[in-house]
A protein has these predicted regions:
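Active-site-adjacent structural patch at catalytic or cofactor/ligand-binding sites
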Residues: 70-74, 78-127
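A general secondary-structure signal for short beta-strands and their flanking turns/coil
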Residues: 64, 80-86, 181-189
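Intrinsic-disorder/low-complexity loop/linker signature
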Residues: 31, 81, 99, 175-176
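Small/polar-rich, solvent-exposed N-terminal microdomains that initiate assembly or binding
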Residues: 1-80, 203-209
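Short, well-structured alpha-helical interface segments that form or flank functional binding sites
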Residues: 5, 64, 84, 136, ...
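Short amphipathic alpha-helical signal-transduction/dimerization elements
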Residues: 15-18, 97, 146-153
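Acidic-leaning, charged glycine-interspersed low-complexity segments
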Residues: 121-197
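Protruding loop/beta-arch "assembly-hinge" segments enriched in small, turn-prone residues
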Residues: 191-209
Length: 209
């Protein structure tokens, strides 16, 4: 399997198996106070990097919330025919605080899963509350990703290297955690293995003919 195929397959798997499991706030840098009408969307998955706003795919509203699937390093064991790749997922979220309409009130509904459905609270009485607790969105997102990764030895036709640990944490600079409030970022790294795409050299091909 080629490097390009691996990155594309993992990105598609992340989009389906991780991003579809959670909805997070859609950023609005022009209105991140009480004027912001809260909107939740599924994060998007991108290969290698997160595109700028003017380069978003048609079905994606904003660069964040998102996951970028990056290749950190790789190695090919030609003798054993094994390719090993270190993959990093870069998770990004946005949350400046609690907005009107964000709180959901449980209402009994026998037809709903668990016996309850949810509806917005009283938005007239709610007020915007700027907080520093938006980091919780990032770690909820991260926990979902870890749960999906740790539950699958084989995903996207690629095998997780179970002998290598899954590592994760916040992004740091000079030992200090990034602080770009109200944006929150973290990473997850893991190792995958697959077969090395084998191509006979011209010299070998001539000998075999």
């Amino acid at each position: 399997m080629t490097t390009k195929e691996i990155i594309e397959k993992i990105t598609a798997w992340v989009n389906e198996s991780i991003c579809s499991k959670i909805k997070l706030k859609l950023p609005d840098d022009d209105m991140n106070d009480a004027r912001y009408e809260v909107k939740f969307v599924n994060p998007a998955a991108f290969p290698l990097f997160v595109p700028a706003k003017d380069r978003m795919p048609p079905n994606v509203e904003a660069p964040i919330p998102s996951i970028a699937v990056q290749l950190l390093e790789g190695s090919d064991n030609i003798k054993n025919g094994i390719r090993t790749l270190k993959i990093r997922l870069c998770l990004s979220t946005w949350n400046p605080g609690t907005h009107p309409g964000e709180k959901q009130i449980p209402v009994e509904n026998v037809a709903a899963l668990g016996g309850y459905s949810y509806q917005p609270g009283d938005t007239e009485s709610e007020k915007y509350n700027r907080t520093g607790e938006g980091w919780k969105d990032l770690y909820n997102f991260q926990d979902i990703a870890l749960s999906q990764l740790e539950g699958e030895e084989l995903f996207a036709d690629i095998r997780m290297d179970m002998n290598e640990p899954i590592t994760y944490g916040p992004f740091t600079e000079d030992g200090v955690i990034w602080d770009y409030y109200p944006y929150w970022s973290g990473w997850i790294a893991f190792t995958v293995i697959c077969g090395v795409p084998y191509k006979k050299s011209e010299a070998v091909r001539d000998l075999l003919n």
